[in-house]
Amino acid sequence: MSDVSGDGDLSATVTEHEVTPQPPVSSATYPSLTVSASYKESSGGKSSSKRRPIRPSFDAAADNEFITLLHGSDPVKVELNRLENEVRDKDRELGEANAEIKALRLSERQREKAVEELTEELTKLDEKLKLTESILESKNLEIKKINEEKKASMAAQFAAEATLRRVHAAQKDDDMPPIEAILAPLEAELKLARSEIGKLQEDNRALDRLTKSKEAALLEAERTVEAAMAKAAMVDDLQNKNQELMKQIEICQEENKILDRMHRQKVAEVEKLTQTVRELEEAVLAGGAAANAVRDYQRKFQEMNEERKTLDRELARAKVTANRVATVVANEWKDGNDKVMPVKQWLEERRFLQGEMQQLRDKLAITDRAAKSEAQLKEKFQLRLKVLEETLRGTSSSATRNTPEARSMSNGPSRRQSLGGAENLQKFTSNGALSKKAPASQMRHSLSINSTSVLKNAKGTSKSFDGGTRSVDRGKALLNGPGNYSFNKATDDSKEAESGNGWKENSEEKPQSEDPEAATEDSVPGVLYDLLQKEVVSLRKASNEKDQSLKDKDDAIEMLAKKVETLTKAMEVEAKKMRREVAAMEKEVAAMRVEKDQDARAKRFSNSKSPSNTAQILAGRAAGRSGGLTKSTQ
């Protein structure tokens, strides 16, 4: 983008690959200015080459530092790029969170399957417990039968002793057969009964041991059942907690969707604002071209006024010299006492000297006002620079880290161009101050126009990384198209004004007609810049709040994942304990089965022996009875 400076020279345009300086309009020599276009990021993804700016030589280093503070990359686009990167990171984090949620769901399904297997094992253990209880009941019945048999054997023993007593009593009374013959079978029966009683006592002891072991096994089984019930309750609690966590995750996802919608709305609003800013920049550039043309005309007009004033002065001097020559010629024939300057000549010389003194006073007043206005503008610029430094400190630091070379190559010439524009405008004010009848209001308007034009140049040169070349192309189009049109139009208007009204009317009417337009053009960018600054601050706050909410959600997800991990570990430990208990129960059941088989075999063996013993006892009893009968018959 090439701008027309206040003194009439065109600054050189620097594109991506070549530098095309344009010739100056006037014959005066001024330092050539350059504008460096920033690196553009094209849609095809091509990387732009390095630019070769032409660096002008300035003497004042303080002015360079002052203008370098005015320049900077576009904060809105940098902030938008940063927000888009953050949104992508958050989307990536959401994808990871969804993957973790899927993994947690799979782990929950596996836990449910494990719980179902444990419930099946518990049902099997309950069935085994019922079987053991039925076996214990059968054993108790057998123990009762054995006790009854024991009581019957004791009763038989008491009956045998009673018979022995009777036999002894009968021997005393009557002559009986020998007692040994009668007692031998009875003693044999007693021995058999005692042996059976000992076996039954051993069986009772073994059954007592079995009952105690069964009771201990039942107690352990009850404990395992209680533990399994507690685990089932824990599993239910875990399922409820998992459902609550799933609900919370869904709520967080809905909140994320709402935040994404809000972010999209903010991005759309920022895009609209950037579009309006671009349109306003285009309008400002168009107004700048027209303003440059108007400044050229004003400068030419002031030069012509100065020439007219010099001609008037020369005419007055010529008149004075002519009058003096006339007086000298007239006084040649007079005496020394009669040689007196005429009153008309003295009045003209006095008027001429008073006019020159008034011009000098006007110049002093104008320079004082210009110095005061420049001091005020400097204070305003310093305040604006402080605000810009505070707002753009974070974004500019990130941007300078990424592209320090691009910043160093693109900032210097553009800032120097804005500095050159300010110097040219100051020269313009100093040249314009030479006019004789310029009022204080016109000087104030011109100073305000010059200050705002400095800001325009600074804003125009501060191109962003994306739209730098676009602004260059727009500046070229504006200078080639509407700039020439406004220039020609201004020349036609000036010719008509000169033909109609003359020098004084043009000098008074042109600034009055151009001041409100310049004021309106200059007041718009500041308001829009403040609005954009407020929007950037609000977007930063929203992004910070969103980051904080996402961090809280990530912390909650991490806590939930830790809880799930601890629960899974507890479930694994409990499953291992259950497996160990089930293995121990199976071993005990196998041992009980072996003992039961041994008991059944022992019972079968005892049952096979008992018929033979009873047959022997009955045979002995029958023989004793037959012997007694024979003795009684004898």
Swiss-Prot record:
InterPro entries, per database record: MAP70
Keywords, alphabetical: Coiled coil, Cytoplasm, Cytoskeleton, Microtubule
GO terms of molecular function: microtubule binding
Sequence ranges of Low complexity compositional bias: 36-47
Main location: cytoplasm
GO annotations of cellular component type: cytoplasm; microtubule
Localization, UniProt: Cytoplasm, Cytoskeleton
GO biological process: cytoskeleton organization
Coiled-coil parts of chain: 74-392, 532-601
Positions of region (Required for targeting to microtubules): 258-494
Ranges of biased composition (kind: Polar residues): 25-35, 393-417, 443-464, 605-616
Highest taxon in the source lineage: Eukaryota
Region (Disordered): 1-57, 393-526, 594-634
Function: Plant-specific protein that interact with microtubules.
UniProt family annotation: Belongs to the MAP70 family.
Protein name as it appears in the record: Microtubule-associated protein 70-2
Native organism: Arabidopsis thaliana (Mouse-ear cress)
Lineage: Eukaryota, Viridiplantae, Streptophyta, Embryophyta, Tracheophyta
Gene: MAP70.2
